[in-house]
């Protein structure tokens, strides 16, 4: 049985791992998941991640906590395979008045909402993180 939405699965694994106070979560890897992980690390939402390529590539994300509480309070999928959500550069949403991030897939790669605004790019809204 194939997975219908691998990005939603990734976000759910991160959310469930943090609720269970896990050190890390493991999932199948893809280029898009690695790019999302890079953004989450740059923005300080996760400690680190690694990709292990034995037979099938596996992505391991090391979760981050502050005073024994998860750094990620909320992580939700916006665009799904059945309902794609796009936004122009002047209509990009903000999470918690700019305290959170929106991850967007643009023509120049996967970017946060702040970087996409500076570059004047719109695209598919992948998820919100706060």
UniProtKB/Swiss-Prot annotation:
The yes or no answer to whether the keyword RNA-binding is present is: yes
GO annotation (BP), single: translation
> What does the UniProt keyword field contain?
Ribonucleoprotein, Ribosomal protein, RNA-binding, rRNA-binding
The reply on keyword Secreted is: no
Q: What does this protein do?
A: One of the primary rRNA binding proteins, it binds directly to 16S rRNA central domain where it helps coordinate assembly of the platform of the 30S subunit.
PANTHER family from the xrefs? 40S RIBOSOMAL PROTEIN S15A (PTHR11758)
Q: Disulphide bridges in this chain?
A: none
The record's listing under SUPFAM superfamilies reads: Ribosomal protein S8 (SSF56047)
Q: Which species expresses this protein natively?
A: Buchnera aphidicola subsp. Baizongia pistaciae (strain Bp)
* Gene giving rise to this polypeptide: rpsH
Q: What is this protein called?
A: Small ribosomal subunit protein uS8
The record's GO CC annotations read: ribonucleoprotein complex; ribosome
InterPro entries in UniProt: Ribosomal_uS8, Ribosomal_uS8_CS, Ribosomal_uS8_sf
Subunit structure of this entry? Part of the 30S ribosomal subunit. Contacts proteins S5 and S12.
Similarity field: Belongs to the universal ribosomal protein uS8 family.
The entry lists its GO molecular-function terms as:
rRNA binding; structural constituent of ribosome
